């Protein structure tokens, strides 16, 4: 099966697993997904992830979801920039998500980072997704 937007697929898997209160979710591995998962782990939205390689199969990431008082820490995760409509933002245009309680994940010339890290580095870029 071909996949047009692997990042949207990962976001949908995380959303579905959190709704079903799963402890872990698997998704095919890629460099972009790894960098987005690094940001989610650094910001405290997931416990972590590990690379699982099975013989004769493509490598996968096993993502450990995080819960607080039985509720998922990721209340909402949504793709912003899509293959059909790319969304770019400068530093001035980056608005806080949910009054600073959420983050935007950006792909910048300096790598994939959160909106606060992008402000510190003074770089804009493609807004991949929003998390709160």
Swiss-Prot record:
Keyword rRNA-binding listed: yes
GO cellular component, one term: ribosome
Keyword Repeat attached: no
GO molecular function terms attached to this record: rRNA binding; structural constituent of ribosome
Entry-linked InterPro entries: Ribosomal_uS8, Ribosomal_uS8_CS, Ribosomal_uS8_sf
Top-rank taxon, per record: Bacteria
Family: Belongs to the universal ribosomal protein uS8 family.
NCBIfam families documented for this protein: PRK00136.1
Annotated protein name in UniProt: Small ribosomal subunit protein uS8
Gene source species: Caulobacter sp. (strain K31)
Record lineage: Bacteria, Pseudomonadati, Pseudomonadota, Alphaproteobacteria, Caulobacterales
Gene responsible for this protein: rpsH
């Amino acid at each position: 099966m071909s996949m047009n937007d692997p990042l949207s697929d990962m976001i949908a898997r995380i959303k579905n697993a959190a709704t079903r209160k799963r402890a872990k979710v698997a998704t095919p591995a890629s460099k972009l997904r790894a960098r987005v998962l690094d940001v989610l782990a650094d910001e405290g939205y997931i416990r972590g992830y590990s690379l699982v390689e099975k013989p004769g199969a493509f490598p996968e990431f096993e993502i450990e979801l995080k819960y607080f008082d039985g509720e998922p820490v990721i209340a909402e995760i949504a793709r912003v920039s899509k293959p059909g409509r790319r969304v770019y933002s400068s530093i001035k245009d980056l608005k806080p998500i949910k009054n600073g309680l959420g983050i935007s994940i950006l792909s910048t010339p300096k790598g994939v980072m959160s909106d606060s890290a992008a402000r510190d580095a003074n770089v804009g870029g493609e807004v991949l997704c929003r998390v709160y």
